[in-house]
Structures are given as structure tokens and as C-alpha cells.
Curated annotation (Swiss-Prot), chain B:
Location of this chain's protein in the cell: Mitochondrion inner membrane
Residues the entry annotates as binding heme b b562: H85, H186
The family this protein is said to belong to: Belongs to the cytochrome b family.
Note: Heme 1 (or BL or b562) is low-potential and absorbs at about 562 nm, and heme 2 (or BH or b566) is high-potential and absorbs at about 566 nm.
Official protein name in the record: Cytochrome b
Gene: MT-CYB
Alphabetically ordered keywords of this record: Electron transport, Heme, Iron, Membrane, Metal-binding, Mitochondrion, Mitochondrion inner membrane, Respiratory chain, Transmembrane, Transmembrane helix, Transport, Ubiquinone
The organism of origin for this protein: Marchantia polymorpha
Annotated a ubiquinone binding sites: H205
Assembly and interaction partners: The main subunits of complex b-c1 are: cytochrome b, cytochrome c1 and the Rieske protein.
Length: 71, 404
């Protein structure tokens, strides 16, 4: 079981709602979102471009095929 | 911690306590780490609903389809059991795929957790077999023809192929013997998955969980209960909502309408499509025009997954600190999505070409893994920007050569 670790002391006290930690959930939401986008936009592109690009290519190809057979 | 119930110190309970209550967990693990326990929940749902469905199901070619209808119409709560079981399989795969990609992103397969990863791949394989034979049981058109197509793949194996197919079928076609052995195996395999999951957990708990930073977290551990338990619970509630939407509002959206037609060996459906969770592998199979080549490619998918911890050369685990790997990871995700999409398209242009490129792309990720780790190690070593650029150039050249 991962050896013997000294676990951090746990204090059983009030529930999370009483600690008012939820109030901090939206704190700096704008900054956090901006930071996320700024740091990950290249990764997002590497995910989206091949998927959307391939789908667009396939649709375009099929449309051209259809028109080719029509005329 | 100071006050602990004495019952938890007793032999059986102490094991339970050590692994599920006082288990030391890294304090920084995120919600992505909740998919492991969620997969366990899915397995429990599948076993429980499956056991109750088996009480009303009849594994006979003349009665199987009707017995499913009987479950849906006559058995009290039968519709719920069946929809939970059918959609539960899809949910199980969604959870396991997310669990898998989390492991891949954060390098959870890297030393010393190779065994955890390999056992995970074995569980995935068992899941695929279980789900496949489970889909045959309703004895609809897609059940019958899916079974015929997939079991026939074994005939591609030289010399013994045809014998294997006859042995799988229990005769000379997919028939009553096939349905009976599939039912028997479908009941057995989930318990083997449960056993493998316990081994997976035992192997994990030997070295402890990985964390988003991918570093040794021995100095910063917290007890599983209540901290991680509460975190997992958030995931369970979110999952319950997501699962309920499918079960109560769109129970057939993930299935195929042809499976509501009784199996007819004299009428082949226009498109034989497997369940959505098999589509990426199915796309790889179809991308190779040779039958044996396709089967070998499927084998290679699982060999690649099993080999991943051993071909990995990176000293850094988490992709948060591996910017180049991070891009390849997202390309792999895109590639798998593309393969999934291609798997349900007809075999015609341009889908064939896209499928073939995506199949190459899938294996390309595993081919560059050893090179990537070494290149990143050099980049870290050489902080000089100019040298870093030259290493990057040599890396890109090697990728180009490999691709060529």
C-alpha cells in the first residue's frame, strides 16, 4: 500500500458550505478562463483542426461528387 | 485519525480500511482521477442489472428476441433494467476511455506503474469481448450480423483460422450453440473483469496514485476518506445525471434501430455497424484492404498499448511539462475521434483515405514515443535557446524521416 506515509492531520469540523469555500469558486473566473485559453489554445487547435478539417473535406468532396454526377 | 474504530483494525476490515479509508492519496489529484472509481461503479451496475436480466432472458434462437421483449413489456421494471444495462455498457466505455486518456496525458503508465497500465489494457480487452458477446444476446439483426462478421475475422488466421471459427460458432454458422456459449461467457467475463480490477487496484496501491504534476508525492498525502471520497462523489452525482438522461430520455440513441428486427440469416442489413465504442478499432480494421492485415492491425493496437510503458523514454510524466508531447496527445485524441467517425461511414471515397491516414496516425503516436522522450530530455538539458532550436529541428527531421 505504497509504504508507510505520515498522513496529514485531519480536523473534522464544519462542512464545506460553512467554510465558505464555495464563495471562492467564481473568484477570478474571468482571469482563470483567460489563462486557460492563453495556455492551451495551441493544444485546442491540434485537437479541433484535424477533426473539423477532415469533416469539412469529406463533406466538400461528397458535394463535388454529387454535382459532378448531376451535370 | 487519532480515534479509529477498533473494528477497522480487524483482519478483513483492516484491508478495507487500508485501501479505501486511510489509503494515502496525493493531495493534488484532480477530478480526472475520479474515473477509476466511476468505472468500478459502472461494473457494479452492469453486474447487478445483468444478473436480474438473466433471470428473465432465454438463450435460444427462437426465444431470445421474444424474451427481451418480454423483459421490456411484462417484467416489472424490466425496461429500466434493460435500458440501464444497454446504456450502462456505453457509459462504462465512456468512463474507461476518459480514464485511459487521463493516464496517457499524465503519464500514469510510466515506471513504476507499468503493471497498473498493462492490467488496465487487459481489462479493456475483456470489456470489449464482454460487450461484443453481450450485444449478440438480444438476437436482433445487428446482433446476428455483427457476430457473423466479427467471428469470421478469425478465419483470416492462416492454417487454423477456419477451425477457430467453427469452434467459436459451435457449428458451421452463427446459431443456437453460438448464442448459448456467448450467454455463458457474457455471465462469466464480468466476474473476471472484477478480479482483474482488484489486481489493477492492488498494483496501483503498491506505489500509490500518480498526480497531475507527475512527481513523487510521498511527502504530501491525505487520507482517501473523506477528501477523495467527497471528490469522487461529485463525479458520481454528475455521472448519475448524465446516465439518467440517456436511460430516461434517449434510451435508444446509442443503439442501432436494426437490432429491433429479429435476426434473419437470409437478410443482410445494408450497413453492418458495431456499437459506437468499437468504431475506432473497426475503422482501423477496415482501413487495410487485406483481411489478415486488418486482424493483425487490431492486434497491433493492443500490443502498442501494452508496450507503451516500456517504449516510453521520458523522465517527465505529466504532459503539463511536456509541451511537444502535449500536442501529440491532442492529435491522438483527434485521431481517435476521426477513426470513430470513419468507422460508421460507408466504405467509399473520401472516407477510406481519411481512415487510412488516421490509422497510420494512431500507430505514429506510438512510433514516436521513444524518440519524443529522448528529444525532450535533450531540450531540458540544453536550456540554451539556440541549441534547443537545433534539437527541435533534429526532432522534426527524425519525425519527417519516420513518416517517410
Amino acid at each position: 500500500m505504497g509504504g508507510k506515509y505520515k498522513l496529514k492531520e485531519v480536523t473534522y469540523s464544519l462542512g464545506p458550505d460553512s467554510w465558505e469555500v464555495m464563495r471562492g469558486l467564481w473568484k477570478g473566473a474571468g482571469y482563470k478562463t483567460h489563462k486557460r485559453i492563453h495556455e492551451n489554445w495551441v493544444s485546442a487547435l491540434t485537437l479541433l483542426v484535424p477533426v473539423i478539417g477532415s469533416y469539412w473535406y469529406a463533406e466538400n468532396y461528397r458535394e463535388k461528387e454529387k454535382l459532378h454526377h448531376r451535370h | 485519525m487519532a480515534r479509529r474504530l477498533s473494528i477497522l483494525k480487524q483482519p478483513i476490515f483492516s484491508t478495507f480500511n487500508n485501501h479505501l479509508i486511510d489509503y494515502p492519496t496525493p493531495s493534488n489529484i484532480s477530478y480526472w482521477w475520479g474515473f477509476g472509481s466511476l468505472a468500478g461503479l459502472c461494473l457494479v451496475i452492469q453486474i447487478l442489472t445483468g444478473v436480474f436480466l438473466a433471470m428473465h432472458y432465454t438463450p435460444h434462437v427462437d426465444l431470445a428476441f421474444l424474451s427481451v421483449e418480454h423483459i421490456m413489456r411484462d417484467v416489472k421494471g424490466g425496461w429500466l433494467l434493460r435500458y440501464m444495462h444497454a446504456n450502462g455498457a456505453s457509459m462504462f466505455f465512456i468512463v474507461v476511455y476518459l480514464h485511459f486518456f487521463r493516464g496517457l496525458y499524465y503519464g500514469s503508465y510510466a515506471s513504476p506503474r507499468e503493471l497498473v497500465w498493462c492490467l488496465g489494457v487487459v481489462i479493456l480487452l475483456l470489456m470489449i469481448v464482454t460487450a461484443f458477446i453481450g450485444y449478440v444476446l438480444p438476437w436482433g439483426q445487428m446482433s446476428f450480423w455483427g457476430a457473423t462478421v466479427i467471428t469470421s475475422l478469425a478465419s483470416a488466421i492462416p492454417v487454423v483460422g477456419d477451425t477457430i471459427v467453427t469452434w467459436l460458432w459451435g457449428g458451421f454458422s452463427v446459431d443456437n450453440a453460438t448464442l448459448n456459449r456467448f450467454f455463458s461467457l457474457h455471465y462469466l467475463l464480468p466476474f473476471i473483469i472484477a478480479g482483474a480490477s482488484i489486481l489493477h487496484l492492488a498494483a496501483l496501491h503498491q506505489y500509490g496514485s500518480n498526480n497531475p504534476l507527475g512527481i513523487n508525492s510521498s511527502v504530501d498525502k491525505i487520507a482517501f476518506y473523506p477528501y477523495i471520497y467527497v471528490k469522487d462523489l461529485v463525479g458520481w452525482v454528475a455521472f448519475a445525471i448524465f446516465f439518467s438522461i440517456f436511460v430516461f430520455y434517449a434510451p435508444n440513441v446509442l443503439g442501432h434501430p436494426d437490432n429491433y428486427i429479429p435476426a434473419n440469416p437470409m437478410s443482410t442489413p445494408a450497413h453492418i455497424v458495431p456499437e459506437w465504442y468499437f468504431l475506432p478499432v473497426y475503422a482501423i480494421l477496415r482501413s487495410i484492404p487485406n483481411k489478415l492485415g486488418g486482424v493483425a492491425a487490431i492486434g497491433l493496437v493492443f500490443v502498442s498499448l501494452l508496450a507503451l510503458p516500456f517504449i516510453n523514454t521520458s523522465y517527465v510524466r505529466s504532459s503539463s511539462f511536456r509541451p511537444i508531447h502535449q500536442k501529440f496527445f491532442w492529435l491522438l485524441v483527434a485521431d481517435c475521434l476521426l477513426l470513430g467517425w470513419i468507422g460508421c461511414q460507408p466504405v467509399e471515397a473520401p472516407y477510406v483515405t481519411i481512415g487510412q491516414i488516421a490509422s497510420v496516425g494512431f500507430f505514429f503516436y506510438f512510433a514516436i514515443t521513444p524518440i519524443l522522450g529522448k528529444c525532450e530530455a535533450r531540450l531540458i538539458k540544453n536550456s540554451n535557446a539556440c541549441e534547443a532550436r537545433s534539437v527541435l529541428a533534429s526532432f522534426l527531421t527524425s519525425i519527417g524521416l519516420l513518416w517517410w
